[in-house]
Amino acid sequence: MRVRYEDEAIVVVDKPFGLPSQAPRGGGANLFDQVRAIWPKAALLHRLDTVASGLVLFAIDPRVNAALTEAFRSHAVHRTYRAVVVGTGLGAEVWDVEVQGKAARTQVESLGTGRGCTAVRLLPHTGRKHQLRIHAAMAGFPMCGDRRYGGEAARRWPRLALHASRLGFVHPVSAEPTTVESPLPDDLVELWQSVMGS
């Protein structure tokens, strides 16, 4: 876990691949417990899939919990992800397909192609469980390493190529626009560079 932003009210940390956001059934290591060990009043406001990596925002002052919970509920927290998907020919588009019977919308931007894959930026407008992975698979561009939704073509990569790279929100105390960014982790850099050609 690496801290990307911290003040008296909130903390934003990088969740590594393979670590659950909160305790799984039966217990075990998880991000929430690690954060609570340092900030005992921390509140988990959203989650990332265990097999994804990237930024997670916590309230560490209970007085801002309600404001941040409402910001997530009303989609006022802007999340940006970077991913690598199987296939080429993807441009700038919007995936607007229900997920588990609920409206779900994801904005997609192609950043480069190579080796039969495409590097993309994803901006979810809703926050359904596994939304980005399901949308990518339904569009015919499963995420590299997605063993649940990706099929055989996606399984040859050792991890899911999905990273929560940016959070933008209005700070609950200062009311200032706040942006926190996270670089790709080392285990995704090589794949990303092979697709982007750099």
Kindly give the residue locations of the regions a language model identified.
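RNA pseudouridine synthases
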Residues: M1-S198
